[in-house]
Structures are given as C-alpha cells and as structure tokens.
C-alpha cells in the first residue's frame, strides 16, 4: 500500500502441537492472538506461518519413547509492533520432555510422577492471553497394577483441555480438547468500533 494504514485487525495463529501415542496427552492448540487497531506500514510485512508438530507413533508401554512434538511459532513481522504467537505444546508421554508440553496452549499430560498436570498455556506470557493449559491424565496412574493410563486433552484458545477419567482398570475416557475462540469482525477502533449488521458474528 501507499502510506501507512491504521485501524487494522491482525489475527496470528501458531501451529498446534501433536499428541503422544498409546494413551498419551493430546497436543495443544497454537497460540491465538487477535489485536485490533494496529498501524501497518506502507511496505511489505514479512509473515511466518508456524507448522503443526510432527505426528508420532510407537509401541505401547515403552518408557522414554515418543512424546508429541511442539508446534512452531507464527510471526506477523510488523516493524512497529511484531506479533508472535507461540506454537502449541506437545502431548506428553511417560513424563518425557515435559517442558515441551508448554506453549501457546498446553499439551495434555500422560500420567507420570513428574508430570501430573498438563502443559501450561500462554507460554511465554502475553496480554491478552494466547491460550490455555492442557488437561491432566487420570490421577491414579497405573494403579491398581495392570490398569492403564489415559491422556488429558490439549488446551484450546478458548478453554483448558479436559482431564482424563479412568473409571476402572480397563475403562475410561480421555480428556476433551479445549474449545477454540470466536473471531469477531470489527472495523475501526475504540471507543466505538463498527461491528456490521451481524454484530460481529459470522
């Protein structure tokens, strides 16, 4: 464009994390950042679109193997105000690479003494928040002996991931993924943005 543009709304969404196999946690959603009233320069703006975390597979009950993978960051490179959304956290598997569970939204956990909770969301922290934490695995782990673990759901832009629920040594439900976030159409800036005839819903 010729000259700067003011009052722009910019949505930046990062790549989501991948889930872990064999009862592991679900991957977290990529960071979600919607900023209104941005001023854009009259020049090309570099944009990086983050990829989702690579999928994984592996044999059952193999300690130390195959956690999920984090998603990659997305960047809107406005020189006046660069906006980065963090990749989603990986689903964890047997407590391996627990820090990879943190991200834009956190990955769900697979029970392990060092990772009882899902990964943190809004990591690194920004305001407004770019995501939510992942859900927990079933709290009792592999108790009684012979039972199995079930992963928590990955966090979403609009809600935390659900916790898993083990109802018997051989039955249960994994945690649901967290909800996404609605996006409204806004034109102009506060205090009186124009939402259009549908009140910003489409």
Where would I find each of the regions flagged by the language model?
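Glycine-biased low-complexity/repetitive sequence motifs
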Residues: 1-202
């Amino acid at each position: 464009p010729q000259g700067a543009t003011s009052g722009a709304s910019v949505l930046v969404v990062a790549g989501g994390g991948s889930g872990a196999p064999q009862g592991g946690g679900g991957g977290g959603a990529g960071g979600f950042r919607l900023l209104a009233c941005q001023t854009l320069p009259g020049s090309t703006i570099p944009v990086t679109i983050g990829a989702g975390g690579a999928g994984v597979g592996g044999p059952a009950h193999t300690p130390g193997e195959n956690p999920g993978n984090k998603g990659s960051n997305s960047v809107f490179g406005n020189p006046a105000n660069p906006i980065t959304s963090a990749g989603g956290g990986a689903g964890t598997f047997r407590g391996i690479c627990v820090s990879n569970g943190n991200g834009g939204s956190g990955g769900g956990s697979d029970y392990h003494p060092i990772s009882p909770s899902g990964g943190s969301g809004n990591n690194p922290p920004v305001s407004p928040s770019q995501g939510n934490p992942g859900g927990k695995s079933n709290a009792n782990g592999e108790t009684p002996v012979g039972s199995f673990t079930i992963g928590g759901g990955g966090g979403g832009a609009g809600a935390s991931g659900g916790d898993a629920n083990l109802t018997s040594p051989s039955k249960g439900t994994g945690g649901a993924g967290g909800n996404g976030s609605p996006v409204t159409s806004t034109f102009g800036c506060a205090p009186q943005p124009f939402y259009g005839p549908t009140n910003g819903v489409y």
